[in-house]
Amino acid sequence: MNLTSTTNCLENNHISTSDQEKLVQPTPLLLSLLKSAGAQKETFTMKEVIYHLGQYIMAKQLYDEKQQHIVHCSNDPLGELFGVQEFSVKEPRRLYAMISRNLVSANVKESSEDIFGNVCCFPDKQSSQKEKLQELPDKLIAPASDSKPCNLSQRKSSNETEEISSVDHPAEQQRKRHKSDSFSLTFDESLSWWVISGLRCDRNSSESTDSSSNSDPERHSTNDNSEHDSDQFSVEFEVESVCSDDYSPSGDEHGVSEEEEINDEVYQVTIYETEESETDSFDVDTEISEADYWKCPECGEVNPPLPSYCPRCWTVRKDWLPEQRRKEPPPSKRKLLEIEEDEGFDVPDCKKSKLTSSQDTNVDKKEAENIQNSESQETEDCSQPSTSGSIASCSQEVTKEDSSKESMESSLPLTSIDPCVICQTRPKNGCIVHGRTGHLMACYTCAKKLKKRNKPCPVCREPIQMIVLTYFS
């Protein structure tokens, strides 16, 4: 993309050729800067001023390497000229204001106004005035012929149609205003950065833009061949002008046509900011105290108790879960049988002890002798014929049974002697079994009713597995 391509962008935004070629005269300081960049004249067009200004910035390498749209001019005469330390080419209003303060328009409007007045006052002499109109664009374009060669005959015809259309429709030319400024950036692989900007305030009528667009392709083709390479691309920004009707306090809202409203585009940008939700943070939980926090042994980070790892170094917390104990395999049936055969029970001590074969025989002999003694005593008691002895023996048996019952009742717990908790009549002989434990608190009949109705144990609320009828001896 070169100067011609940028000109094409400007013309597509309804900027006429006459406004592009308006001559301006820079101040002495700005003129010296432009001449150091290769300028050889004293009057320039607006496009030429910005072109040479871009060449100056590029030669001095005042642009930022990372952000090329920013120009640093604090230690340069350009900063003294504009009165700033740095500026951005993405701010066309500011750039246009800084440049326009150092420009003076050339005094070339008097001849054009006289010619336009003669055409309006003397319609009979239009044929002679057309020749003067053809000579006027030559005078305007002649100072800029060194930097931009173009087709003279094509430009004459385009300028003639523009001037006639502006004379025929002066009111329509005043009514239509241009509301946006065109600002183009051009990037080159070899030069890295340069800028050309066309800024204006007035918009011409639709007839003048149509005639100028028909005369532009040939001029674009000649300039494309003589300027820079084709490896460049342009970025165009549309911004509101300072001189437009929207910014003037006395602007007429009804002076904008429907075509201009259609051409204007509005972009809406919505920016969303992501924030951490308060529910994700552990600091909100007031139940967690400082003693519950744990310190990572690797990085020393103090972490909340909930995650099992350190969020900084991903180290798993020690003793997070208890160690799994290995279950020992159950002993086989053969080993159990061997243990039962080898071990016996000592009755008075209730301790397991191994019995030898000699001890087994002695135990058997003692048991046999005890049985014989008891039988001999019974026979002797029965052989006595006296009635007094029989009555005494019977009384002794009754007293023995009563004493045995009393001893049994004293040996039983108090809870088993009490009646059933549910019916309060029958004894507690129904044991409610659940797992390896049971509760004796009801009779067998009431306990069976609880099991049939799928009720839990009244004591521990565990599901009932079975009911066992219990006997007390």
UniProtKB/Swiss-Prot annotation:
GO aspect biological process, one term: apoptotic process
Compositional bias per record (Polar residues), positions renumbered to this chain: 370-397
Keyword Cytoplasm listed: yes
SWIB/MDM2 domain ranges (all copies): 22-105
Keywords of the record: Cytoplasm, Metal-binding, Nucleus, Transferase, Ubl conjugation pathway, Zinc, Zinc-finger
Composition bias, Acidic residues: 273-285
InterPro entries: Mdm2, MDM2_mRING-HC-C2H2C4, p53_neg-reg_MDM_2/4, SWIB_MDM2_dom_sf, SWIB_MDM2_domain, Znf_RanBP2, Znf_RanBP2_sf, Znf_RING
UniProt motif (Nuclear localization signal) ranges: 173-179
CDD domains (UniProt xref): MDM2, mRING-HC-C2H2C4_MDM2
Location of the region described as Region II in the Swiss-Prot/TrEMBL record: 230-322
Chain ranges of zinc fingers (RING-type): 420-461
Pfam family, one: zf-C3HC4_3
Highest taxon, organism lineage: Eukaryota
GO cellular component: cytoplasm; nucleolus; nucleoplasm; nucleus
EC number: 2.3.2.27
Biased segments, Basic and acidic residues type: 216-231, 398-408
Job of this protein: E3 ubiquitin-protein ligase that mediates ubiquitination of p53/TP53, leading to its degradation by the proteasome.
Protein name: E3 ubiquitin-protein ligase Mdm2
Organism whose genome encodes this protein: Xenopus laevis (African clawed frog)
Organism phylogeny: Eukaryota, Metazoa, Chordata, Craniata, Vertebrata
Chain's gene name: mdm2
